[in-house]
């Protein structure tokens, strides 16, 4: 009889509806609820009367369900439901492939800032594309091209700095005078009434004026008198002028 009672008791226990308890709520076996608007919890019961709740996934802000250990790209964001060995689950969010860049540019959009072109790449990452010369010449990143007749290298360095500079030594370029002759860096030469000096990148800069009756170069904004003639070499802004004045009375 005692045995039957025990059996009866076991039978009664096994037929009782076992439920999970979570935050003061009763949950049926296999019932799934969402908590904290971010996690999916499932009730699991056993015939022996034991039960447990298990986090089986996450829920994104827009309601998309993600199983634990998986990730999904929703719009311009990637949501990952991470489950650790200890059973802790966390919902992580990162930029998706089509995310916008920090400046608001859309995925794939190109734009120019001063002399540099950029593109909004995957994950909202700004990608350096090319250098642009004043004449509109474009040199792709990492390459060398010609701008204004000079070899220019367009480069992004490891620290993120972007440079557009002469590919060769600035002093290695020759200047070309109006008569077609070549002048070395540092060499002075006469063109009409002006004296030029060959500078870096092959740029001939006016350093003074020239007069047949004056032995030396007349400096900028200086006057030199030879006989009864005054020779004047002046600069006004970016304009240079050479003039002569007679000291003879009319």
UniProtKB/Swiss-Prot annotation:
Residues making up the signal peptide according to the UniProt record: 1-17
Cellular localisation: Secreted
GO cellular component, one term: extracellular region
Superkingdom classification of source: Eukaryota
Entry-listed glycosylation sites: 48, 159, 223, 239
Swiss-Prot/TrEMBL keywords: Glycoprotein, Secreted, Signal
Name of the protein in its database record: Uncharacterized protein ZC412.3
Organism: Caenorhabditis elegans
Organism placement in taxonomy: Eukaryota, Metazoa, Ecdysozoa, Nematoda, Chromadorea
């Amino acid at each position: 009889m005692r045995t039957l009672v025990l059996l009866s008791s076991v039978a009664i226990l096994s037929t009782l509806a076992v439920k999970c308890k979570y935050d003061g709520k009763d949950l049926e076996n296999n019932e799934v609820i969402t908590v904290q608007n971010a996690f999916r919890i499932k009730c699991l019961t056993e015939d022996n009367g034991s039960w447990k709740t298990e986090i089986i996934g996450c829920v994104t802000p827009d309601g998309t369900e993600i199983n634990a250990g998986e990730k999904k790209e929703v719009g311009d964001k990637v949501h990952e439901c991470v489950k650790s060995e200890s059973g802790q689950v966390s919902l992580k969010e990162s930029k998706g492939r089509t995310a916008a860049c920090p400046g608001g540019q859309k995925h794939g959009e190109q734009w120019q800032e001063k002399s540099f072109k950029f593109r909004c790449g995957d994950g909202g990452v700004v990608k350096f594309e090319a250098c642009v010369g004043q004449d509109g010449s474009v040199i792709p990143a990492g390459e060398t091209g010609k701008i204004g007749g000079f070899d220019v290298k367009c480069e992004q360095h490891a620290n993120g700095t972007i440079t557009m500079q002469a590919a060769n030594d600035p002093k290695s370029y020759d200047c070309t005078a109006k008569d077609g002759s070549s002048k070395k860096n540092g060499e002075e030469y006469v063109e009409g009434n002006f004296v030029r000096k060959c500078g870096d990148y092959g740029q001939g800069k006016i350093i003074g004026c020239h007069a047949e009756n004056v032995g030396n170069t007349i400096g900028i904004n200086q006057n030199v008198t030879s006989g009864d003639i005054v020779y004047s070499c002046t600069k006004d802004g970016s304009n240079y002028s050479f003039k002569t004045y007679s000291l003879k009375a009319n």
